[in-house]
């Protein structure tokens, strides 16, 4: 499973670069004693701390600690905290942590939250810029 997760992180890196972000994987992000996202990306206007997840189906559950560490890193780095989720045969969807649904002890992305996720172009701001004629 670890190699599959790494492959998805690398796939997302390619998509981020195509969308105009400089992006890197954070090696050992899951085992660091410090808060560490899976990917850090930026395009000069927007900076992202991303926790990468892939699932065969919904819901996706995230521990409160995992979300808290992502938010802690993002605040310290000056980035926006996102969870990027990949489902089979679907595009990457990005969820700002504020969009995650709170459960009794944790967080989740389920069928009601998933359609609200952002596409990579929306996160990059291209949708807004193209709409108003600004070149990207």
From Swiss-Prot:
The active site is at residue 29. GO terms for molecular function: crossover junction DNA endonuclease activity; DNA binding; magnesium ion binding. Its EC number is 3.1.21.10. The keyword GTP-binding does not apply. GO terms for biological process: DNA recombination; DNA repair. Binds 1 Mg(2+) ion per subunit. It catalyses: Endonucleolytic cleavage at a junction such as a reciprocal single-stranded crossover between two homologous DNA duplexes (Holliday junction). Its cofactor is Mg(2+). Keywords: DNA damage, DNA recombination, DNA repair, DNA-binding, Endonuclease, Hydrolase, Magnesium, Metal-binding, Nuclease. The record marks 53 as: Transition state stabilizer. Homodimer. A structure-specific endonuclease that resolves Holliday junction (HJ) intermediates during genetic recombination. Cleaves 4-way DNA junctions introducing paired nicks in opposing strands, leaving a 5'-terminal phosphate and a 3'-terminal hydroxyl group that are subsequently ligated to produce recombinant products. Belongs to the Holliday junction resolvase Hjc family. This is Crossover junction endodeoxyribonuclease Hjc. The lineage of its organism: Archaea, Methanobacteriati, Methanobacteriota, Archaeoglobi, Archaeoglobales. The gene is hjc.
């Amino acid at each position: 499973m670890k190699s599959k997760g790494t492959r998805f992180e690398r796939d997302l890196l390619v998509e981020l670069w195509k969308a105009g972000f400089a992006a890197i994987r954070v090696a050992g992000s899951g085992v660091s004693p410090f808060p560490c996202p899976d990917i850090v990306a930026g395009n000069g206007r927007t900076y992202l701390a991303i926790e990468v997840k892939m699932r065969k189906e919904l819901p996706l559950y995230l521990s409160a600690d995992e979300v808290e560490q992502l938010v802690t890193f993002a605040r310290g780095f000056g980035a926006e905290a996102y969870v990027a989720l990949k489902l089979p045969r679907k595009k990457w969807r990005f969820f700002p942590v504020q969009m995650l649904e709170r459960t009794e002890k944790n967080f989740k992305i389920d069928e009601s939250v998933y359609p609200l996720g952002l596409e990579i172009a929306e996160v990059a701001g291209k949708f807004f810029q193209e709409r108003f004629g600004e070149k990207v």
